[in-house]
């Protein structure tokens, strides 16, 4: 049996895949090492989102390779191992590659390891064997055939056995994307959207809740397209009804990557009806000017988007809406950029993430004329971030004096010995949004009610007015320390 250490780069979907690999390895008797130094095999789950992510991936692979002993092996798995397999496989020290559709074979790779082995990619057009290669490049006998339909299905049926859980966990409900946005490479290595069966999702959600998870974050490349390949209309709303039927009311369900053209009346009503569903929606929009959106190959109807946001706020008055945008897309004029700023000022999103346009080889956007200079992109990024910083602060100030429920994530001690706890409200997704801080020692994984006393640009401070134990309110307060 081998000791394995997994390093995860990139998005929450990658984190779920790493947890899947971890569970498969543990089920086969392998142990997970706390560090690369202690491992027989180091797996780097790579990211290929944009050029900067690929540069980080290669840097991490080089760093791990430089430190590994002659007995250790290095596996590059995931997105960049799929999208740029030749480059990854040629990186000195990488002993094997495993693409995004192959990670359920990780135990086989670990157990049949050969020095300088590599894995042949799956051919999406026909059945194909996974063939380990010797250091001389001569094919070894393949252990057995693997058909592509099975490969696509494996990730949907493979159990995600998490060895350790925190207050929140990601649950991936689909993989791949049917959209073909001009700037995006993801469909080229993820393929079309493929949904996980509702029953499998419910089983995973119940396991997470039974393990003590208090927040389940649903993720996908395109969350609101869920179930289309299964023949479902309003698939996400149907799934949410089923999830909320099996989860206790004290478990949050959060929606991320919910594209607007999949949001309709039924989904909005479902979000408003169930107490488990956070009044929060991450809705990527990318831009707000119709001409920019057309070049992006995104729906250009900004007026429809405004109406959708109005509908969401009418049905769920306290909803926190997050969006992401791209600045510096080819041909973005100053007029188009100003229209984006005006849109943010008008709509008043609670949370916003902004990407600088990255010219990705092979995408339609890379061939567009009028590519913007990096200095212009950088200037526009800073301008839009300054605007959103002010908007975020103003949105936060609306909560002064009000009580918010907070999921406690951690605690610590200041230099002068005061205990400080930190968590998130329903308005804050893990890793990308703000936090709520308060004095005192609260137990991670519990809910507390906090009265907001200070609003910063992205975070809130407050005083605890009550704690929750299970599903019942306890009328007591954590004593403030100073």
From Swiss-Prot:
GO MF term list: 4 iron, 4 sulfur cluster binding; aspartic acid methylthiotransferase activity; metal ion binding; protein methylthiotransferase activity
Cofactor note: Binds 2 [4Fe-4S] clusters. One cluster is coordinated with 3 cysteines and an exchangeable S-adenosyl-L-methionine.
Keyword Mitochondrion belongs to the record: no
Swiss-Prot/TrEMBL keywords: 4Fe-4S, Cytoplasm, Iron, Iron-sulfur, Metal-binding, S-adenosyl-L-methionine, Transferase
Catalytic EC class: transferase
Residue numbers binding [4Fe-4S] cluster 2: 177, 181, 184
Cellular location(s): Cytoplasm
Any Gene Ontology biological process: tRNA modification
One Gene Ontology term, aspect cellular component: cytosol
Ranges for domain MTTase N-terminal: 2-115
Stretches assigned to the Radical SAM core domain: 163-394
Family: Belongs to the methylthiotransferase family. RimO subfamily.
Protein name, per record: Ribosomal protein uS12 methylthiotransferase RimO
Native source species: Roseiflexus castenholzii (strain DSM 13941 / HLO8)
Gene: rimO
């Amino acid at each position: 049996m081998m000791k394995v250490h997994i390093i995860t780069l990139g998005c929450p979907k990658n984190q779920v895949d790493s947890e899947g690999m971890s569970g498969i390895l543990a089920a086969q008797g392998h142990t997970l090492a706390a560090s690369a130094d202690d491992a027989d095999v180091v797996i780097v789950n790579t990211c290929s989102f944009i050029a900067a992510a690929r540069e980080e991936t290669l840097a991490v692979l080089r760093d791990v390779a430089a430190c590994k002993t002659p007995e250790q092996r290095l596996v590059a798995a995931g997105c960049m191992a799929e999208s740029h397999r030749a480059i990854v496989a040629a990186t000195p020290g990488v002993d094997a590659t495993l693409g995004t559709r192959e990670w359920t074979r990780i135990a086989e790779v670990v157990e049949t390891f050969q020095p300088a082995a590599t894995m042949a990619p799956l051919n999406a057009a026909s059945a194909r064997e996974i063939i380990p290669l010797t250091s001389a490049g001569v094919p070894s006998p393949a252990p057995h055939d693997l058909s592509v339909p099975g490969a696509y299905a494996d990730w949907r049926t493979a159990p995600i056995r998490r060895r350790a859980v925190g207050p929140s966990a990601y649950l991936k409900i689909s993989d791949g994307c049917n959209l073909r946005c001009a700037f995006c490479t993801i469909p080229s290595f993820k393929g079309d959207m493929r949904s996980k069966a509702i029953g499998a999702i419910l089983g995973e959600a119940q396991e997470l809740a039974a393990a003590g998870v208090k927040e389940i974050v649903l993720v996908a490349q395109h969350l609101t397209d869920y179930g289309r390949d299964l023949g479902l209309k309003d698939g996400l709303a149907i799934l949410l009804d089923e999830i909320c039927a099996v989860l206790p009311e004290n478990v949050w369900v959060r929606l991320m990557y919910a594209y607007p053209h999949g949001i309709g009346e039924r989904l909005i009503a479902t979000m408003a009806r169930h107490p488990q569903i956070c009044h929060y929606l991450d809705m990527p929009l990318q831009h707000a000017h119709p001409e920019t959106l057309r070049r992006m190959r995104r729906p250009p109807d900004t007026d429809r988007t405004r109406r959708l946001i109005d509908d969401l706020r009418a049905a769920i008055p306290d909803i926190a809406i997050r969006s992401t945008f791209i600045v510096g897309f080819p041909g973005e004029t100053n007029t188009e950029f100003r229209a984006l700023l005006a849109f943010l000022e008008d709509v008043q999103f609670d949370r916003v993430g902004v990407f600088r346009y990255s010219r990705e080889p092979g995408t339609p956007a890379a061939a567009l004329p009028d590519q913007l200079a990096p200095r212009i992109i950088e200037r526009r990024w800073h301008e839009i971030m300054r605007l959103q910083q002010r908007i975020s602060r103003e949105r936060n100030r609306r909560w002064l004096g009000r009580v918010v429920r907070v999921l406690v994530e951690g605690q610590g001690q200041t230099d002068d010995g005061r205990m400080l706890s930190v968590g998130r409200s329903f308005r804050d997704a893990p890793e990308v949004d703000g936090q709520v801080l308060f004095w005192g020692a609260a137990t991670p994984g519990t809910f507390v009610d906090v009265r907001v006393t200070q609003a910063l640009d992205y975070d809130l401070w407050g005083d605890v007015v009550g704690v929750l134990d299970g599903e019942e309110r306890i009328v007591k307060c954590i004593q403030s320390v100073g």
